[in-house]
Amino acid sequence: MGDWSKLPEELLGLIALRLYSVIELIRFRSICKSWRSSASGVNKNHSLSSPLIYFKPLQIILARAQANGQILSKYHGTVLSRATFFRVTLASSPDQGWLIKSDTDLKYRNFHLLNCLSRKALGRSRKLISLSEFIVSEIQESYAVVGRRTRETASEFKRVFLVRVQGGDHRVLVIGIDGKIRFWKGGIWNGIKKQVAQFSDFVLDEGLTYAVDTKGIMWWISSAYDIIRYGTKLHENITNGSCGEKRFVRCRGELYIVDRLIDENLLKRKADSYDDNAIVHFRNADYTNADLWEDGNGNDDFFAAQAHRFIHVLHDNLGNVSCKPFERDPPKTIGFKVYKNDEELLKWVEVKSLGDKAIVIATDACFSVSAHEFYGCLPNSIYFTDKKEEEVKVFKLDDGSITTMSESEQSCFQMFVPSFL
């Protein structure tokens, strides 16, 4: 057998550039000294690296000063955060494994594990894990906007989507809690005028960016940020007129839409409990004299002393909109429906069975897995959490039942509890 350490450096460099995940790059660099040095520049220029983008937040606090009526505003800085989902198996038993989620510090050989269905950090572990004992494969990457200091997910975003541009600046698209699409450009969040829909999710398909709204209508988003209706909507006779959360997912080689079903009556009662007259809109206000600052030291004394009335607003280049209508406690999930586009019938049809597949719905990603590849994973099911909750639940498409992790003695949640931690 030849000496692999003597392969030409140019060839090793080309191999390193074609590695598909950070884990593969770590494995490559650990082979020997020559392989490690050949990949020394890959981390900086590799397509897997996460762009470091700092944002002004979408949500700010506005206040009117007591002394002169001046409108003051306050915000905390935010940054784009990348996380990755992995399948981990024992090298000695690779048939089944676990699902884990880690932030980008993984490239520094540290597992900073996150809750799989949210982005909250799990308890720190000092246990060292040797990659020689495990097989780690990347499933999906995801993005969120988090606080620079707190690293907590910014609550004003429903979705954060990164469009990588070869040789150019990457594009960041978001869906705010108001259901509107915005993009980051010129040091500010930019709104798109004349949006007629409330949006729910993004997907990149064959190089094009699409969004789905709460009625199940797909829209194409051009490189100039024009939003153009694309295709048919989900018919009300199969959705029962639901305008809840819709998510894109690739499953069995096709693009599906997952519709989260909620208690519409409960949602209406919560909406009716709000006084519409209390909703304050500052859109197109004049902020020539506004004092915008970042509280880098956590000192709120000046702000609290000077202000007598304040409000949380979503701020972009078009103005401000009050957050209050979007801060209601969400109702519980009562089920899901799954749809795919029938190209012959030219309409969305309901999918009754996922076969061996299971769908994982996280706050920052939605993807499918082969159930037989994960410990305890139920086929034809959907794993999820309710909003503002951490507990994992599973919905079974065959009987419509929902099982909660804390209330179950079943092994169907074993995939989220690695034995090596």
Swiss-Prot record:
Record's note on what induces expression: By heat stress.
Q: Which UniProt keywords apply?
A: Stress response
| Biological process, per Gene Ontology | response to heat
Answer yes or no on keyword Transferase. Answer: no
Domain F-box: from-to ranges: 2-50
Q: State one Pfam family annotation.
A: Beta-prop_KIB1-4
InterPro entries, per this entry? F-box-like_dom_sf, F-box_dom, KIB1-4_b-propeller, SCF_F-box_domain
Q: Which SUPFAM superfamilies match?
A: F-box domain
Q: What protein does this entry describe? A: F-box protein At2g17690
Q: What does this protein do?
A: Involved in heat stress response. Contributes to recovery from heat stress.
Organism (species): Arabidopsis thaliana (Mouse-ear cress)
Q: Which Gene3D superfamilies match?
A: 1.20.1280.50
